[in-house]
């Protein structure tokens, strides 16, 4: 997995192969303009474009002194990052993409969303849709939520496999005589042929192994199977995986078995499609991440019932407003929040602070105009107002 950072100007020679046709060079530099993900078949790897908020304020470094070029190969063996930095980049990369993916699903017609046709989300609960990265997240989530299921399957698959089939062993194997007693060094157990249930498990664990080893997403997996790796797994990603899964599909009926099969099939269907193309055909990118950030915060704290007063009469727009208990008397009052898409260490400007005071004054005026309920906000005896907390995120 390759890591790029929004807003940073890279030397063209450093990232030209990574960016492909997604970014244009100017004066020998390529500036990353979007946040999100794409798979580049030229380098055979996923590329994550991170939000610029990890930039050190007032500097051209990131995460406390790293260069953007250091972070490009954060998950390679020659990386300059220590374990803590690498873990942060991994978690932040996945968090950023999940945020973008959720926004794109909820705002399919937004002009800031740029995605491939193959990455469209399906409304069917049974299907696995989105980009390759969405499929990978679905695989990891299924594994983490169903570890008891995997242990149960593995236990059942291997029960009885260590029992020796003495009739076949005596008929087909030559013993060694020791002190007049035959000793069979090579025995035949009761496993007669490929078990299709086990083949599905081998395929699934091989996918997890590939994700962990090649994409920089660490997944702690305990598995005793002989996994599909190297050139053989490459063949699976180029079409053999779909063929094998179609051959054993008839074996599965339970919901979890079918879900496991669908996840494996979706993975190989995605990889075979994007690797056979010469162009970048699997991507999900956002042109204005500050809008995504604001939407995410508002989904967490905003009050949908108050969305109508966000656009104020003086033309100003509140980012977040909600009702919550006053720390003074416990009555419900209004809280106003402002989302700031800043670099690490940046300070809030005087203009932003002034706007917050204006928002609070407008809230008071709305009470006079009858736009807001006055219960718990204005004291009927003194006609004084409870305070209006303002904060920045």
Which ranges hold each PLM region?
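Helix-loop junctions and short alpha-helical segments
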Residues: 249-256
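Catalytic core segments in nucleotide and nucleic-acid processing enzymes
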Residues: 1-54, 273-393
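Terminal, charged accessory segments of proteins
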Residues: 1-240, 256-274, 278
């Amino acid at each position: 997995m390759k890591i790029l950072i929004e807003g940073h100007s890279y030397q063209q020679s450093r990232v030209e192969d990574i960016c492909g046709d997604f970014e244009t060079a100017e004066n020998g530099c390529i500036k990353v303009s979007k946040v999100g993900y794409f798979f580049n078949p030229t380098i055979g790897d996923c590329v994550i474009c991170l939000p610029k908020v990890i930039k050190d304020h007032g500097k051209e470094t990131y995460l406390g002194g790293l260069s953007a070029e250091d972070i490009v190969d954060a998950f390679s063996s020659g990386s300059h990052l220590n374990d803590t930095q690498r873990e942060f980049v991994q978690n932040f990369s996945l968090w950023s993409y999940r945020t973008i993916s959720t926004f794109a699903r909820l705002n399919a017609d937004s002009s800031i969303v740029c995605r491939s046709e193959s990455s469209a989300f399906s409304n069917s609960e049974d299907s696995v849709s989105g980009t390759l990265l969405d499929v990978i997240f679905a695989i990891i989530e299924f594994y983490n939520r169903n570890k008891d299921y995997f242990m149960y399957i593995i236990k059942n698959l291997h029960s009885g496999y260590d029992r020796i089939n003495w009739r076949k062993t005596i008929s087909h194997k030559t013993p060694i005589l020791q002190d007049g007693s035959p000793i069979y060094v090579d025995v035949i157990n009761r496993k007669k042929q490929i078990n299709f249930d086990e083949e599905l498990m081998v395929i699934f664990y091989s996918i997890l192994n590939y994700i962990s080893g090649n994409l920089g997403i660490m997944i702690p997996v305990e598995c005793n199977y002989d996994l599909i790796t190297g050139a053989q797994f490459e063949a699976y990603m180029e079409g053999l995986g779909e063929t094998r899964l179609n051959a054993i599909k008839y074996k599965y009926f339970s919901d979890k078995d079918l879900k496991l099969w669908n996840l494996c099939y979706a993975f190989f269907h995605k990889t075979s499609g994007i690797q056979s193309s010469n162009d970048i055909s699997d991507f999900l990118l956002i042109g204005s991440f500050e809008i995504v950030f604001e939407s995410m915060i508002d989904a967490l704290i905003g009050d949908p019932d108050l969305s109508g007063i966000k656009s104020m009469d003086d033309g100003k727009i509140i980012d977040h407003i909600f009702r919550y208990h006053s720390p003074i008397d416990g009555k419900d009052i209004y809280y106003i929040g402002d989302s700031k898409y800043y670099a690490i260490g940046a300070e809030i400007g005087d203009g932003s602070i002034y706007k917050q005071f204006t928002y609070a004054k407008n809230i008071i005026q709305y009470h006079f105009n009858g736009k807001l309920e006055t219960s718990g906000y204005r004291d009927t005896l003194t006609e004084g107002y409870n305070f209006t907390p303002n904060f920045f995120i």
